[in-house]
């Protein structure tokens, strides 16, 4: 009886901790409905550089709160790219309302996601961005779930972005802990983290643990992740995301009229460090 009581108390405390963040966000929003997706804001946030102002290649990763109540728990992420000298951006993402869920199309790179403003997660420019773009079409064509979409625990839009990042050694980007689906590995159990320097163990996206230089430490329970990020001086809360003093992802810093390739401040190890430009990395076991 005591064992049952302890298990019940432990389960209650765990669920309370996991749901505290989403419930807090819901309370702050007043539990208001987001309205119709047809009329929700999809305008550009003006974050990405205009093509006429930036001649260099650009690769950016964005995230925005998922539509309606799902936004209390998770993000929708996507990749935006512009080739050197191009006059527009391509947006690469997964959506759940088509048979073929993957789409790459000309579009504004930083549009609001049905009322939710986007946040820039990573910004890579110059020669490094060109090398990433050169590999992107071939990598996207190999995405293993082109007609599958499951909001929880995956595969979903975050699964797609995390998978693409893992396949391109130079695209080492840590996704936010509340991007539910990023830890979905399909039939795999162990993988390198998207950030490139570290590993994770995941059981179908429901449970797992992650340790990486960019990501820090994360514990995944039922798709909701919590943890700490020593390099960013931050903590990770379910639903809320990472509260940190700095970003560990590559970010462009203006230094004149034209961009130079982003220099990585984080040491690269494993497959990411050993791979050369143009080589596809297979990081999931």
Label the model's feature ranges.
Residues 105-170:
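Mid-length scaffold segments of soluble, non-membrane domains
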Residues 97-98, 119-133, 184-194:
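Intrinsically disordered, glycine/charged-rich N-terminal periplasmic/extracytoplasmic linker segments
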Residues 31-46, 50-124, 146-149, 230-240:
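Glycine-rich catalytic cores of cysteine/serine-nucleophile enzymes that process amide/ester linkages
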Residues 7-14, 28, 55-65, 69-79, ...:
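Hydrophobic alpha-helical membrane-spanning segments
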């Amino acid at each position: 009886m005591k064992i049952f009581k302890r298990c019940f108390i432990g389960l209650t405390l765990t669920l309370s901790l996991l749901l505290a963040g989403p419930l807090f966000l819901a309370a702050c929003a007043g539990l208001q409905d987001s309205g119709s997706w047809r009329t929700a804001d999809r305008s550009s946030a003006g974050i990405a550089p205009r093509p006429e102002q930036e001649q260099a290649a650009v690769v950016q990763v964005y995230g925005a709160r998922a539509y309606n109540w799902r936004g209390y728990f998770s993000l929708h992420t996507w990749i935006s790219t512009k080739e050197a000298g191009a006059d527009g951006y391509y947006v690469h993402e997964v959506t759940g309302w088509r048979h073929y869920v993957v789409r790459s199309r000309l579009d504004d790179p930083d549009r609001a996601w049905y009322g939710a403003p986007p946040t820039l997660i990573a910004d890579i420019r110059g020669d490094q961005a060109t090398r990433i773009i050169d590999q992107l079409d071939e990598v996207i064509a190999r995405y293993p779930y082109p007609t599958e979409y499951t909001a929880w625990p995956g595969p979903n839009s975050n699964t797609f972005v995390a998978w693409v990042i893992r396949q391109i050694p130079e695209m080492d980007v840590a996704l936010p802990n509340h991007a539910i689906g990023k830890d979905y590995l399909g039939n795999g159990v162990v993988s390198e983290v998207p950030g490139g320097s570290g590993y994770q163990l995941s059981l179908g996206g429901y449970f797992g643990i992650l340790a990486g230089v960019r990501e820090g430490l994360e514990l995944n329970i039922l798709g909701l992740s919590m943890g700490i990020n020593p390099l960013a001086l931050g903590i990770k809360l379910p639903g809320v995301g990472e509260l940190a003093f700095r970003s560990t992802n590559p970010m462009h810093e203006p230094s004149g009229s034209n961009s130079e390739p982003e220099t990585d401040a984080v040491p690269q190890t494993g497959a990411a460090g050993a791979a050369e430009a143009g080589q596809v990395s297979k990081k999931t076991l």
